[in-house]
């Protein structure tokens, strides 16, 4: 099977699982915004925001090492899984130790043990599901994802609509669904069988920790870029403002979801390709069409966002639509940064990954600290946008030191300017549809050749 077909096949498999999963999550937002106040929704999201940070710290990001070393072929995969589970046990102990300290944060003190159980279950989830990829069980991976989300949605309906449990119901839904799917993946994914024949290798343990440990700072930096603004909005503005900001961030998540579907397949493909060949044309083509897709999707979503949000969210969250356009542009540059992050992973340049993300995180913290006290939610939006732009451009430049990925700079910059101006105009409610039409026409004219190639390839694929 050619590498393009293999990449497409893996992407489609992950798409089945991810689209089903994310569609359910997307449809749950109206439920949350109608059965929870903006303050409750903000509190719940704050807990999950902190959980993301703790997962990276307590796990030493070992789940990334599981897939990297499991796919490399130089190690026995069951031994790789054993290292993952050893780290998981340590994370349980360390997590229980620091949870009372985390509970000193007043907003989440009531929910600290809910946070703990969600974090440890999420670490196990990431280890198990990455290992399913190592085993080539991508179909099971997709099916289990859909099942977990379906259970989460069902629990949410029960706890929020029938029991009116608010934040408690929201947290219980995620904890119970993650716990059940962890057990299912362990049994039906036959991970128990893999562990039964595993042997501890000290050298492998050290190598995996050496690979994953620098990723802690990288992931923490990503957390700062992606989520620290939520904590700062809660502290500097209000929990209700955080709820509105969270609702606004759900729409850009659609682009992030689509990219993550591709990214899961791309991570596997680039690791395999980097160890056998280093043809820049392949990487350049993939990047070109990834940017074409994400920027095009951004234009479409920004155009319809005002009308869509009117029907999508509860009335208490009505102002959220204004923040979405610039967050959508942020999602485009996040996709660019993630693409180059995969190249770092394949090249085992985790230190570069860490430092480029750390730079953007520092930029984000400074801008948030300066702007949020005066501009509220807008300060967080601007900080997020600038941080993603910084990390995207820095990585594009840095990766060229190790491999050549051809990028048409004129086209890339032109499209970037178009989507940025379009987003600003829509956020300001300035001649939305006239500006949108001009932006789309400019986008099509710039990408006419590449769009034509895509149409021809798609037509051939359909006619087969």
Describe the role of every protein-language-model region.
Residues 1-24, 67, 75, 139, ...:
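N-terminal membrane topogenesis motif
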């Amino acid at each position: 099977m050619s590498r393009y077909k293999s990449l497409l096949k893996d992407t489609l498999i992950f798409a089945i699982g991810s689209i089903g999963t994310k569609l359910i999550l997307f449809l749950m937002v109206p439920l949350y915004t109608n059965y929870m106040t903006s303050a409750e929704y903000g509190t719940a999201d704050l807990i999950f925001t902190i959980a993301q940070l703790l997962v990276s710290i307590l796990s030493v990001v070992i789940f990334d090492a599981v897939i990297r070393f499991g796919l490399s072929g130089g190690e026995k995969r069951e031994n790789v899984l054993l290292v993952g589970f050893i780290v998981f046990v340590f994370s349980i102990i360390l997590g229980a130790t620091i949870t009372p300290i985390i509970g000193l944060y007043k907003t989440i003190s009531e929910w600290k043990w809910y946070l703990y159980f969600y974090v440890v279950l999420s670490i196990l989830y990431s280890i198990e599901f990455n290992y399913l990829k190592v085993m080539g069980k991508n179909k099971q991976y997709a099916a289990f994802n859909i099942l977990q989300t379906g259970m989460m949605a069902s629990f949410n309906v029960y706890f929020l609509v029938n029991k009116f449990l608010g934040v408690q119901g929201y947290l219980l839904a995620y904890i119970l669904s993650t716990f059940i799917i962890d057990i299912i993946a362990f049994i039906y994914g036959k991970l128990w069988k893999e562990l039964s024949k595993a042997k501890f290798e000290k050298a492998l343990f050290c190598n995996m920790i050496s690979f994953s440990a620098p990723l802690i700072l990288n992931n923490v930096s990503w957390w700062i870029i992606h989520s620290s603004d939520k904590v700062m909005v809660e502290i500097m503005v209000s929990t209700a403002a955080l709820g509105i900001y969270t609702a606004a961030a759900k729409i850009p998540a659609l682009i992030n979801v689509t990219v993550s579907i591709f990214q899961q397949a791309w991570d596997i493909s680039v690791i395999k390709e980097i160890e056998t060949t280093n043809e820049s044309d392949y990487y350049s083509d993939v990047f070109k069409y990834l940017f074409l897709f994400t920027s095009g999707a951004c234009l479409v979503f920004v155009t319809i966002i005002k009308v869509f949000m009117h029907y999508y969210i509860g009335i208490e969250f009505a102002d959220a639509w204004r923040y979405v356009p610039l967050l959508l542009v942020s999602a485009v540059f996040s996709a660019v940064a993630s693409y180059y992050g995969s190249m770092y992973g394949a090249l085992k340049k985790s230190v570069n990954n860490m430092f480029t993300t750390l730079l953007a995180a520092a930029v984000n913290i400074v801008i948030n600290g300066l702007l949020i006290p005066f501009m509220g939610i807008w300060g967080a939006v601007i900080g997020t946008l600038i941080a993603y732009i910084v990390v995207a451009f820095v990585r594009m430049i840095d990766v060229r030191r190790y491999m050549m990925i051809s990028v048409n700079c004129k086209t890339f910059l032109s499209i970037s300017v178009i989507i940025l101006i379009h987003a600003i105009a829509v956020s300001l409610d300035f001649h939305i549809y006239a500006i949108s039409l001009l932006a789309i026409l400019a986008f099509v004219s710039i990408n006419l050749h590449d769009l034509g190639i895509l149409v021809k390839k798609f037509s051939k694929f359909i006619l087969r």
